From Swiss-Prot:
Binding site for Zn(2+): 430, 433, 448, 454
Catalytic reaction equation(s): NAD(+) + (deoxyribonucleotide)n-3'-hydroxyl + 5'-phospho-(deoxyribonucleotide)m = (deoxyribonucleotide)n+m + AMP + beta-nicotinamide D-nucleotide
EC number, UniProt record: 6.5.1.2
A Pfam family that the UniProt record links to this protein: DNA_ligase_aden
Residues reported in the UniProt entry to bind NAD(+): 42-46, 92-93, 126, 149, 185, 301, 325
Domain called BRCT: residue spans: 640-719
Name of the molecule in the record: DNA ligase
Family stated for the protein in its record: Belongs to the NAD-dependent DNA ligase family. LigA subfamily.
Organism of this sequence: Brucella canis (strain ATCC 23365 / NCTC 10854 / RM-666)
Signal peptide: none
Gene it is expressed from: ligA
Function: DNA ligase that catalyzes the formation of phosphodiester linkages between 5'-phosphoryl and 3'-hydroxyl groups in double-stranded DNA using NAD as a coenzyme and as the energy source for the reaction. It is essential for DNA replication and repair of damaged DNA.
Gene3D superfamilies reported in the protein's UniProt record: 5' to 3' exonuclease, C-terminal subdomain, 6.20.10.30, BRCT domain, DNA ligase/mRNA capping enzyme, Helix hairpin bin, Nucleic acid-binding proteins
Length: 719
């Protein structure tokens, strides 16, 4: 997960991170829901989901079809249990992590219903059980099936195993509706978990990690006798398909479940105020250590079922419920060292090496230290944190399993009379490649400037270099780039952009032939070589974009190409541009610097990134090798087109049927227009295809002209 704030991500960086997050979250969903083998904590998973949602909110045009925000859980594992399609989807809940989040949730309920706070809508509050979600179906009072949640739409048929859980009735009392689906959580009591582990240890077998995983694994045993021996339990709290509703409130339905013989949680209560909900949350939190079952928060639900119906659902969660998660757990240990990791974007991230400590049932040896200011005791806005205490090797530190993929150090405990180590000096040189590491003004992160040579960034940089809007080399996808990068044979390896263009020649002089390697063949290799050769001449803006200079995305690459017209002119400007001396108000910087700032849309942040990139000798060496193989074509000078859209800002939305989105952007730019990804007051024209949604609504609201795709072709004279 990137450490760059969402607001500072470029569109390219955002798209790349959304792709990585989609893969990571899908991977962890499968491990958690389908294989019962989670690799990360719930808090770490929640952090990935929050990061994904934050990026999507900031870049709505980049929301993917496979976005985790549109998905619940994971599809059931194959070839184990028969699939069951839920009559009503089993959705997940949105999360709240603070009192303010809860107040926002309650406020959103009132606003949606058009009611005032003094109308006193009642909410229920109950512990969020850390187990396995289950749907149990009864027809004419007889238990006919039990299914896991799966991906929310399709679960697994575990009926035989459900029947072994003593707390789940096989029959409902007379008078129950003809069709009943009772939903709840299967879990293992802490005491039963300890007994089971003691038994496994006595038998010389491997013990289990935690009650949740054990319950999930026990329920998905192919032999129901194994499930029966595990003493699984159940809490009922919801329902699916019902032929008749026996109550009109959430609390009333749970009481009906109790009367039918299902266990229900005794800590569930009803409140008419946010303060009541939060007080109960804290009370349950205090009682949490004494409970014989694991919980990870408190769930709030609108009590009246008619209001639940009016509130309805979002794509993956109800509007009438939310899960208020408990804060992370903490422990005290010793900081033994600090290592610096270099991320794919060149960010230098300090990682604490700790004396091993158990936090929340997991042994922790590493923790994130975020950035150099965090080590110094300085917050994101320059304010003191931890009362200004810095972090030093040898300190006693408080470790928390929180919202990061790895735990974090949240405080330092200073011991009176104990001599501390020296203040930590954050490196100004990349430990991976030796290039300068710079920190931009206003940034918390220090970054390596050796983008084209740094091994920590190389794979990501090459992927970017061959991507569609850069060199667009067909046959060099993600897997192929990793294969060539990891190849040890000099005739195969691709470690820098220039290596791509020398691959064919190296292969001709080698006994190791690419076409003989699994996954390749004579035809595919020829196509790859042809695709590479086709890019030996490349448009200047594509060349600049492909270099991966920070802040030089597709738009800025085009701006620079149009301003300098040739690569030679751009390179000369980049090498001669000298920023003004810090603190010297009379210094305006070199003439080349001032010229670069005069380019429309290019400010000091972009210009500094260009200067830093070309100021790194390693990058210039890699560029020299690349330019020996590739020729950036001069950009044609922009002339007035006389087009009716010249100088206007155009937004394309919906499904385009006569052209791709990239073709649409290129056509607009060919006619002198600028394209944007979102609608604002600066937008002049919206071209809307079928399925246009929020952008079309925004354009209508702002009174912006909207035309269809056919009208667009007529307008620009290309019909």
């Amino acid at each position: 997960m990137s450490d760059i704030s969402v607001e500072k991500l470029t569109e390219l960086e955002a798209a790349a991170e959304l792709e990585r997050l989609a893969r990571a979250i899908a991977h962890h969903d499968e491990l958690y829901h389908a294989k019962d083998r989670p690799e990360i904590s719930d808090a770490a998973y929640d952090a990935l989901k929050r990061r994904n949602e934050a990026i999507e909110a900031h870049f709505p045009a980049l929301v993917r079809d496979d976005s985790p925000s549109r998905r619940v859980g994971a599809a059931p594992a194959l070839a184990t249990f028969a699939p069951v399609v839920h009559a009503r989807p089993m959705l997940s809940l949105d999360n709240a992590f603070s009192d303010e989040d809860v107040r926002d949730f309650v406020g959103s309920v009132y606003r949606f219903l058009g009611q005032l706070p003094d109308d006193s809508i009642a909410f229920t509050a109950e512990p969020k059980i850390d187990g396995l979600s289950m749907s149990i179906r009864y027809e004419n009072g007889i238990l006919v099936s039990g299914a896991t949640r799966g991906d929310g739409t399709t679960g697994e048929n575990v009926t035989a195993n459900i029947r072994t859980i003593a707390e789940i009735p096989n029959r409902l009392p007379a008078g129950a509706p003809a069709v009943v689906e009772v939903r709840g959580e299967v879990y293992m009591a802490k005491s039963d978990f300890l007994t089971l582990n003691a038994q496994m240890e006595a038998e010389g077998k491997q013990t289990y990690v935690n009650p949740r995983n054990t319950a999930a694994g026990s329920l998905r045993q192919l032999d129901a006798k194994v499930t029966a021996s595990r003493k699984l339990r159940f809490f009922a709290y919801a329902w699916g398909e019902m032929s008749d509703m026996p109550a009109d409130t959430q609390l009333g339905m749970v009481e009906v479940f109790r009367q039918w013989g299902f266990p229900v949680n005794p800590l569930m209560k009803r409140f008419n105020s946010v303060d009541g909900l939060l007080a109960h949350y804290r009370a349950i939190g205090m009682e949490r250590p004494t409970l014989d079952y694991d919980i990870d928060g408190v769930v709030y639900k609108v009590d009246r079922l008619d209001l639940q119906t009016r509130l309805g659902f979002r794509s993956r969660s109800p509007r009438w419920a939310i899960a208020h998660k408990f804060p992370a757990e903490q422990a005290l240990t010793i900081l033994r060292g600090i290592d610096i990791q270099v991320g794919r974007t060149g960010a230098l991230t300090p990682v604490a090496r700790l004396e091993p400590i158990t936090v929340g049932g997991v042994v922790v040896t590493n923790a994130t230290l975020h950035n150099e200011d965090y080590i110094k005791g300085i917050g994101q806005k320059g304010e003191p944190i931890r009362e200004g205490r810095d972090i030093r090797i040898g300190d006693s530190v408080i470790v928390q399993r929180a919202g990061d993929v790895i735990p974090q150090i949240v405080d330092v405990v200073l011991e009176e009379g104990k001599k501390r180590g020296e203040p930590y000096q954050f490196p100004h040189v990349c430990p991976a490649c030796g290039s300068h590491a710079v920190r931009e003004e206003g940034e918390a992160v220090r970054r390596c400037t050796g983008g084209l040579i740094c091994p920590a960034q190389a794979v990501e940089r090459i992927r970017h270099f061959v991507s569609r809007n850069a060199f667009d080399i067909e046959g060099l996808g993600e897997k192929q780039v990793e294969f060539f990068f990891n190849a040890e044979d000099p005739a195969l390896c691709i470690r820098s952009p220039a290596d791509i263009f020398t691959l064919k020649k190296r292969q001709e002089n080698s006994l190791t032939k690419l076409q003989n390697i699994e996954g390749f063949g004579a035809t595919s290799v020829k196509k790859l070589y042809d695709a590479i050769d086709a890019r030996r001449e490349i448009a200047l803006h594509r060349f600049l974009f492909g270099l991966g200079i920070r802040h030089v995305g597709e738009v800025n690459a085009k701006r620079l190409a149009r301003a300098y017209l040739s690569y030679a002119a751009f390179e000369k400007a980049a090498l001669e541009a000298v920023p003004p001396k810090e603190g010297d108000r009379t210094d305006k910087g070199s003439e080349a610097w001032q010229d670069m700032l005069a380019v429309e849309g290019i400010g000091s942040i972009v210009a500094e990134a260009v200067v830093d990139f070309y100021g790194e000798p390693h990058n210039r060496e890699v560029l020299a090798a690349l330019l020996a193989e590739v020729t950036p074509l001069d950009e044609e000078a922009r002339v007035a087109t006389g087009s009716p859209v010249e100088g206007k800002t155009v937004v394309f939305t919906g499904s385009l049927e006569r052209m791709s989105r990239d073709e649409a952007k290129a056509m607009a730019e060919r006619h002198g227009a600028k394209t944007a990804g979102s609608v604002s007051k600066k937008t002049d024209l919206v071209v809307a295809g079928p399925g246009a949604g929020s952008k079309l609504a925004k354009a209508t609201e702002l009174g912006i002209e909207v035309i269809n795709e056919d009208d667009w072709f007529k307008l620009v004279g290309e019909d």
